[in-house]
Amino acid sequence: MVRKNALIYFVLIVVLVVASGFSMGMGAVKIPFTDVMIVLAQKIGLFGNHIVPDQFRGVLDIVRIPRVLLGIIVGAALGISGTAIQGIFRNPLAEPGLIGISAGASLMAVIIIVLELSIFASLSNLLGYYLLAFGAFAGAGIAALLVYQISRSDGRSNVATMLLAGIAINALAGALTGLLTYVADDQQLRNITFWMLGSLAGATCETVMAVTPFIIIPVLLLPRMGKALNAFALGEVQASQLGLKVNVIKRNVVVLATMGVGASVAVSGIIGFIGLLVPHIIRLIMGVDNRHVLPASAIFGALMLTLADMVCRTIVAPIELPIGVITALLGTPVFLYILIKDKRKLVL
């Protein structure tokens, strides 16, 4: 089993590296895979004598490399956060959006887009593009905090109440988002629509560096909770009898998932299906041990988003499709197949 898991990790990493290289070469400007590898190798001090056209080098440095790196870290955050949320709620259909994280981020982003000039003018001048990112991140955090506080009773948080609170927050955020969309002008409506459908088009080196710390923390810490999430599969009472601090674990998982998803939504908009689909595929490959499923979900999430981004840039090039549309179109048939194939196992 150890060798099998090690082999799976190795294959996933190799495929991710190769897919990233091909993705950097795809788009309106086609760049040979060998030139991509040479540029990447030169950045670490190798192949110093090889010459790559300046046009290719500029496209890679300014656009493609930051975009692919952002896709990798966002995909990793969405994949591992989805796995952790499913584990803590013991619900194979759960995802971060279920507890209001995505809805809170969306609402705050729409508020900023619609009211930026009238209310957030000074902040917009100070933060520029990052105002939307900070706002979305704050919205995700506020929504998660509300859900967690509503679900607490006598110092404990109830999973069923948390799910119901998440549904309520989603409904409220959806209603307010719809209201703001209704009063938005044409340009604001276009911005809202593009952001709600998700995109990595705005990736820069600064964006990658700004969001990486918020994503690295959950990606590194959530796998350490794999053993505890395995115990949660038996039920909260049984996990408590095994000596686990159930409320502390639930709080930590929700906080870390919120950090990862909130940061991802802040820089890429709403990208669906990664957090829902990735855990199912990894469990089919590696089994249900969260000690292995969590890190593998991060790698596979990065791979899925990298491939989806490559498709959205090339399928109707030079026009670029929203990445959320691609993940939904690719993910829905696979997810339905999994549901039909294993529907007896997925009965809650």
Stretches found by the model and what they are:
Residues 1-348:
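Alpha-helical transmembrane segments in inner-membrane proteins
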